[in-house]
Amino acid sequence: MSDHTTPTPDLATATRQQFASDNYAGMCPEAAHWFHTANASGHAPAYGDDDWTKRVSDRLRETFETDCDVYFVFNGTAANSLALASLCQSYHSVICTPVAHIETDECGGPEFFSNGSKLLVADAGGEAAAHGKLTAQAVETMVLKRSDLHYPKPKVVSLTQATELGTVYSVDEVKAVTAMAQTHQLKVHMDGARFANAVASLDCHPADITWRAGVDVLCFGGTKNGLPVGEAVVFFDRALSEDFSYRVKQAGQLASKMRFISAPWLGMLESNLWLQNAGHANAMAQRLRAHLAKIPGLSLLVPTQANAVFAQLPQTVISRLQAQGWRFYEFIAGGGCRFMCAWDTTEASVDAFAAAIASAMKDA
């Protein structure tokens, strides 16, 4: 017998709700119900020809109040990369912000699947840039920068809603960017990994910040909002989705048992649970922000408009919190930390984390 002893896990830490990512959260009960219901229904056609996938696609059309094309993929990187590839040729370019997920966190996926379309980073400057947003002027500056054939021709504008800094484009801000895009014959892609949080924050109809505002394709996130896996790629301009199913298959994103990706969406779309979950996550972020605002020496970095809170902490405080088992990301150099709340984040978890930060700051 080995004399090696496996350490007993600290269950308090192991089961603690964390603030690193909304991906840490599990599946909400309603999504789980439909997952298991689909499983209990027995055999069903494969590769998306099942009634579950058709039913959810119709429900999404009802949600957006338009006849859109809907596809399901496993994750957000695939959704963004394949959607952009459908809008671009290899000699085209995509205009985005310096902090866009497609620029910083998708391992070159958009470029790979488009056979080389270049990402053009546009710095809006001022408050917009500080809040992770594009502006109409920033888009036009990039379009007019060069027009010769030695430069990748701008073809798409990509907006992230909510942004990577936890801010939200207003309806008018979206319209301003899309109007400029249309002026220069550009298509508009929306990375909506946290689209639900943006809609809940704005308290608007989902169509008002998508197709009615000039967005051509939306990558609608579900994984961060209570689903087990899967994002929906929604083409409001259906002509742009021609042959998209081939792209999905080629990229290894066509689930043979598609119903297990699509069916859980029913739990989200019925009774607007997708907005309730997102609204709760947003509210928990506001609660955390309110706690942190009272801590001497702690700086809050950007407005909290969705489910993220950004704060500046001394490195000694960061290290102490991490040693205590708290998990969060350092996204900004010099102690800028991101704290994410999820659909299941409890008030008790928020209060405990805030208390830990306050204690660490007091001793710093």
Model-derived regions, located:
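Conserved PLP-enzyme active-site core in the AAT-like
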Residues: 2-324, 330-345, 353-363
